Amino acid sequence: MDKNRISAMLDGVDRYPFHMPGHKRNTALLGNEFPYDRDITEISGSDNLHDMSGVILEECNRASRLWGAVGAHILVNGSTCGILAAIRALAGHDRAVVVARNAHKSVYNGIELCRLRPTYLYPKMDAESGICGSITPGQVDAALSDAPDAKLVIVTSPTYEGVISDIAGIAAVAHARGASLLVDAAHGAHLGIGQMQAHPVTFGADIAICSLHKTLPAPTQTALALVGKTCPNSAAFAAQLAVFQTSSPSYILMEQSARCIHLLEQRGAELMAAWTERICAFEREVAHLTHLRLCFRGELPACAWAYDVGKLVISTRGTRLTGHALAELLRDEYKIEVEMAAGDYIIAMTSLADTDQGFSRLARALCEIDARTEADAERQGCFFPQLHAVDAPWQAADLPHLTVPTAQADGCVAAEYVWAYPPGIPLVVPGELVTGELLAALAQMQKSGTELHSTSGAMPQTLRVLED
């Protein structure tokens, strides 16, 4: 494979470094386990991530062409920095924002920083799996009608579980009402390559943020911001990236991002086709599961507009297994570690770097576990209630609060976030009313094996709530 421009530049660095970083590329002292020889700073012949004019700009232009965007930015602080920058550039301050309630916690951090008033979009839930479905254009239109001062709509597509929303329809509605569309596509970097579904940026997203490291062969923390042709202020977005992204970006991460882009440019269609075939072979191998179930295959539930087949969501509903128990069996007996376990399902994330052997190993394990699993129609599935927002998150964070036993928080207004990680989607947001139904759901999640976290770090024992 031909080298990308960043790799070629790093190969040519042969000057003694009287500059940062402090390791001075001294592999004789430090060893070769880490690529110190490629860890440079902004020296002559390199480039500046926040004022691109050379090799970094060339690789970003490659990414723009590959995904069909009008602009691209390599991100070394993960998708989080791109989301924060996009919110600050597009949403304004002290006004409404329309946001899917199943957004990542980085979105809520951006809402707090910009003192925005969220109008939430609640996706319908698939009754069989307990998984959130798509956001619809009709929901967005109604929300913008209720919040006419909103300048930004934020949706997640694909979701952590792989559910895709009608981005073209949502973009049309948002733009007709004078709002921009930010798509958190952190789990969709592979979309738009080969025969995979088109990427949100080609469907009308003004900015789409995708994590290269989640579904493509790139190291943790690498991500990409793709700018659409309708973005109202790409210069403001670039300026905000300089605020939320490090001023000392790692050339190691940027090089690996460029290598990933280069690989997709040269072999993307071939690799995506092979990946798709492996998924199809896996589906055939698990087609006769009796108790466990591979979700979102065949006819999709009404609540899902489309689905990313690269996500393998295996449901344990109707069995004596929880998702956590299934994950533990796979880990302990089959040496397979899945991405996430919830009360009623597991998520196995796949990518073009998976092998035939890896897929077959998972399929055999699931078939063996399924054969010895018993049905249990009595076991209740985990459903999460829709909550009522009394205050905006930033308002609740600024108000006097106290700490109470979680079981006694019914009727109080939350003053902190509660979430399960992964995926980092808040179950409770500051300013939301705590109900008995919510407390029962949290208790059920904990009983099933889900670890709950909170801003104070005291969940599940106590919860911060607003004073009366």
Place the predicted regions along the sequence by residue.
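Electropositive phosphate-/nucleotide-binding environments in soluble metabolic enzymes
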Residues: 50-57, 80, 134-138, 161-164, ...
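N-terminal "arm"/small-domain region of PLP-dependent enzymes with the aminotransferase-like
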Residues: 1-54
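Conserved PLP-enzyme active-site core in the AAT-like
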Residues: 5-8, 29-30, 66-69, 79-298
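Charge-dense polyanion-binding interfaces
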Residues: 451-468
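Structural signal for conserved beta-strand scaffold positions within catalytic alpha/beta enzyme cores
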Residues: 74, 120-122, 210, 340, ...
